[in-house]
């Protein structure tokens, strides 16, 4: 039940804090998990700041040195532990803490199992899909580098990258790469470099270490931040056998910081060699083409027609004249044949013409209606007839019919 109070009848601080202490006391003893962010020993007591493994939340834990030493080996800063503790609320100061009764290290097998469950969950969301990974630029203008302060990883990346491409530029952000400050500092550096207008690719690099040392690079919040980045990210954490979750979400995984430098910038010597090879190949192709054309020209030049072109022209002229004469003869013969044929046809037409028959003394006899009379039997005495001769005609009257005396 809530405490009764009003502006006129408020509850004293001690009463409220005592009530809060009572509520907390009723929680009982519980197991909690976290990472040791700070550890101080004073007298016979140990004071621990325990950080949540995912969220930026921490709590104060106190225990005796005996309890601390019982967790063989005693945990140090950065260790992942589970604590059996009793919640405690100190009323005089209004502070909350846990009184640890037992501390245990999180086992390697349990850590690996949790990481695998997280990996599967993130993979199911599509954060590790190859389709969302971006290609690195061939020659980045500026490379962002997130690494430990004065670390071997930083030296490896810078030295190898500059050896390969001396003109490469870097924006370096030195951060904590293990412990409770690693995740927030790496995320802050990532956000800053991702917003940098000249940075074309970001390398997150760290040397080798134990599974616990590399845990920050399997942090869910960091993995999601890398997935959301607009700039391509290269993961170069630990050695080749180390595989934090950052390797899965990064656009490219490098086995070591040195390998990251090799994958991010090209080798100037290799590029010069490639240019030389391409230049030589182009020269060979060009020279081969010229040689083929020269051979073709030589073969054309060696042909007889090109050795004495006037002779070939004269030969063609003779062929033209010969064809002209042949055509003329053929045309003349055809015209002669056509003339003879026409004369023959004219003679036949003349022989068959009625005018020719009339010229030999014959006449055509017609009645008054124009019908031709073919026999005297067709004419009645006294009938008017019209006679047509070769050049003129006359009108006659039939009198008597005579028998043919021929």
Curated annotation (Swiss-Prot):
This is Exodeoxyribonuclease 7 large subunit. Keywords: Cytoplasm, Exonuclease, Hydrolase, Nuclease. Bidirectionally degrades single-stranded DNA into large acid-insoluble oligonucleotides, which are then degraded further into small acid-soluble oligonucleotides. Its EC number is 3.1.11.6. The keyword Cell membrane does not apply. Belongs to the XseA family. The gene is xseA. GO terms for molecular function: exodeoxyribonuclease VII activity; nucleic acid binding. It comes from the Bacteria. Heterooligomer composed of large and small subunits. Disulfide bonds: none annotated. InterPro entries: Exonuc_VII_L, Exonuc_VII_lsu_C, OB-fold_nuc-bd_dom. One of its GO terms (cellular component) is exodeoxyribonuclease VII complex. The keyword Nuclease applies. It catalyses: Exonucleolytic cleavage in either 5'- to 3'- or 3'- to 5'-direction to yield nucleoside 5'-phosphates. It holds the Pfam family Exonuc_VII_L. It is found in: Cytoplasm. NCBIfam families: xseA. GO terms for biological process: DNA catabolic process.
